[in-house]
């Protein structure tokens, strides 16, 4: 779990958010979401490598969404949100037609929360 905490903290730094006191809760929530979608019982030790980055993205998305809904991002400079993010050999480019930085932030937040859900189908187990 410590490795996942470090990954979440590093990704939050991309959004210029340094403190996250409830990382464990949001990591557990993200893992539960993945388990519900895939009908699996993964733990932090048993989660496949292909799902680890999805777990981190979902946890970061949940933290940012929580802070936004609670008004903790009132003073956040949304203009600093990037139009594209590159992770490894994958580049995620967000809409060029977005009018405001807040809309761009919403698109990025949505991508963190559910943008990779189609990849979860590979790990889905059918229940009989």
Question: Could you tell me what each predicted segment is?
Answer:
Residues 61-128:
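Short loop/turn elements at secondary-structure junctions
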């Amino acid at each position: 779990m410590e490795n996942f905490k470090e990954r979440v903290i590093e990704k939050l730094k991309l959004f210029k958010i340094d403190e996250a006191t409830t990382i464990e809760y949001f990591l557990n929530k993200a893992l539960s979401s993945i388990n519900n979608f895939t009908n699996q019982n993964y733990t932090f030790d048993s989660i496949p490598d292909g799902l680890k980055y999805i777990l981190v993205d979902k946890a970061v998305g949940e933290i940012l969404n929580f802070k936004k809904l609670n008004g903790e991002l009132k003073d956040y400079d949304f203009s600093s949100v990037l139009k594209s993010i590159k992770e490894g050999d994958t580049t995620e480019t967000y809409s060029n037609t977005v009018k405001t930085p807040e809309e761009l932030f919403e698109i990025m937040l949505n991508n963190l929360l559910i943008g990779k859900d189609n990849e979860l189908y590979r790990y889905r187990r059918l229940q009989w």
